[in-house]
């Protein structure tokens, strides 16, 4: 049997052409559709995977937010309890301080009232003692006491400082009169004694001298001329006694 090589090659060529046609018109579109479908499936799978990951992430975030909210709630509750306790303690402390302050103020007022009462009482006693002493001296005044008062006043005139004498003797306006005020009437002898002391001490140049009785002066003598004043009596000693008693009874 003879082989027809031409036929063989023709069949092979036909087969190759058929394969090419099949591949080009049948397999390639099928492969393209399959590739496209596979790409769509892969894309859908990736989308599903992404959605699942997003869902998982959202769920995880939700759990985290829940935990954060729980922690914040616990923190807020703890802070509220702490603030309430602190406010209660502050109010209790304020109440105690107010009570203590009121108590101290009441005690201070009580002590102040006690001190004021005893201070007033001591002052009244001191003033009464001095008043009794003044009245006793007035009641006991006699000729001997009057003589001693006049003598002390004349002695004070003799011991005036040069500055005092200069001030009295060189007044801008000469005095029209000299007034001698006493708590008791002076007899002629005592008046003459005082006039003599004034004449030897001051430059009065015939200025009239008037004697005036003022019982309120107590045991003392007061000289006044042109605004100048010379005083001697027991009142300064009694005033000093009153001040000493006032200081001692504070």
Curated annotation (Swiss-Prot):
The chain crosses the membrane at residues 2-22. InterPro entries: ATP_synth_b/b'su_bac/chlpt, ATP_synthase_B_chain. It holds the Pfam family ATP-synt_B. Keywords: ATP synthesis, CF(0), Hydrogen ion transport, Ion transport, Membrane, Plasmid, Thylakoid, Transmembrane, Transmembrane helix, Transport. The keyword DNA-binding does not apply. CDD domains: ATP-synt_Fo_b. It is a single-pass membrane protein. F(1)F(0) ATP synthase produces ATP from ADP in the presence of a proton or sodium gradient. F-type ATPases consist of two structural domains, F(1) containing the extramembraneous catalytic core and F(0) containing the membrane proton channel, linked together by a central stalk and a peripheral stalk. During catalysis, ATP synthesis in the catalytic domain of F(1) is coupled via a rotary mechanism of the central stalk subunits to proton translocation. Component of the F(0) channel, it forms part of the peripheral stalk, linking F(1) to F(0). F-type ATPases have 2 components, F(1) - the catalytic core - and F(0) - the membrane proton channel. F(1) has five subunits: alpha(3), beta(3), gamma(1), delta(1), epsilon(1). F(0) has four main subunits: a(1), b(1), b'(1) and c(10-14). The alpha and beta chains form an alternating ring which encloses part of the gamma chain. F(1) is attached to F(0) by a central stalk formed by the gamma and epsilon chains, while a peripheral stalk is formed by the delta, b and b' chains. Belongs to the ATPase B chain family. This is ATP synthase subunit b 2. The lineage of its organism: Bacteria, Bacillati, Cyanobacteriota, Cyanophyceae, Oscillatoriophycideae.
